[in-house]
Amino acid sequence: MNNRIILFQNFGLKHWIDMFNKMHAFTEVRNINTYDEIWFLEHYPIFTQGLLQKINTITYNNDILHDIPIVSTDRGGQITYHGPGQQILYFLIDLKRRKITIRDLINIMQNLIIETLNYFSIKSHIKKNSPGVYVNNKKISSLGLRVKKGFTLHGLSLNVDMDLTPFNYIYPCGDINIKMTQVKEFNSFLTLNDIRVILIKKLSQLLNVSIIEKFSIK
C-alpha cells in the first residue's frame, strides 16, 4: 500500500444518516493496508449537533424550522447546518500512519480552505479559539472531527452557493455572534466543481500526496 496516495470519492447530494453510517462502516473494517480516503459530498437540509453542544443554541421552535431535521452526532463542535450548495469533505485518515496529530490535521484543513479561497482572490483568515475559516469576520467554513482508534471521521464544510437562511434559526457553533457567508457573495460565477478541483490540488500539496479518484485504482 502506497502511503503517498489518498483516494477521493465524489458522492454528490446525499442524506446525512446514510453517509454517517457509511463512514463508520468504513472505519470499522479498515486496516493497515487500507488507503486513506477523502469524501466530497453535499447533504440534504439538516442540523447536526456535535459533542460540545450547549443548550439554547436553537433560536426558533421546531414549527419554524420548516421540518429540517435535527440530529446529534459524534463529531466535535456544536450545532451547524448542512444543505445543498455546501461542499463537505469527510477526512478518513490514519493519523498514526501519517505521523500527524489531530491538531496538525485541523491546521491542514484550515489552510486548505484559506489557500483554496485565495486561489479565487477571496481573502480569508482564522480566529483564535474559534476553529473554522472566516471572510470579513463572517464564517465561511466549519470544522468538526472525531478520532476513533487513531482514525479520523467527519471533516469540514465550505459554504459555496447555498441558502443561508437556516443558519438564522441557530447560533452556529453555539456562538450568538457568528454570522455566516459563502463563496457566492464574493464570486457568483464559481461552481462546486470549480471549488472541488482546487481543493484536490491544494490537498495534494498540503498532505504531500497524490489525490487519486478511488475507482481509478486497479
Swiss-Prot record:
GO terms for biological process: protein modification process. Pathway: Protein modification; protein lipoylation via endogenous pathway; protein N(6)-(lipoyl)lysine from octanoyl-[acyl-carrier-protein]: step 1/2. The keyword Transmembrane does not apply. It comes from the Bacteria. Keywords: Acyltransferase, Cytoplasm, Transferase. Pfam families: LplA-B_cat. Its EC number is 2.3.1.181. The record marks K139 as: Lowers pKa of active site Cys. InterPro entries: aa-tRNA-synth_II/BPL/LPL, BPL_LPL_catalytic, Octanoyltransferase, Octanoyltransferase_CS. The active site is at C173 (acyl-thioester intermediate). One of its GO terms (molecular function) is lipoyl(octanoyl) transferase activity. Substrate binds at R75, G76, G77, Q78, I79, T80, Y81, H82, S142, L143, G144, G155, L156, S157. It is an enzyme of class 2 (transferase). Residues 32-211 form the BPL/LPL catalytic domain. Gene3D superfamilies: Bira Bifunctional Protein, Domain 2 (3.30.930.10). It catalyses: octanoyl-[ACP] + L-lysyl-[protein] = N(6)-octanoyl-L-lysyl-[protein] + holo-[ACP] + H(+). It is found in: Cytoplasm. The keyword Metal-binding does not apply. GO terms for cellular component: cytoplasm. NCBIfam families: lipB (TIGR00214), PRK14342.1 (NF010922). Belongs to the LipB family. Catalyzes the transfer of endogenously produced octanoic acid from octanoyl-acyl-carrier-protein onto the lipoyl domains of lipoate-dependent enzymes. Lipoyl-ACP can also act as a substrate although octanoyl-ACP is likely to be the physiological substrate. In the reaction, the free carboxyl group of octanoic acid is attached via an amide linkage to the epsilon-amino group of a specific lysine residue of lipoyl domains of lipoate-dependent enzymes. This is Octanoyltransferase. It comes from Buchnera aphidicola subsp. Schizaphis graminum (strain Sg). The gene is lipB.
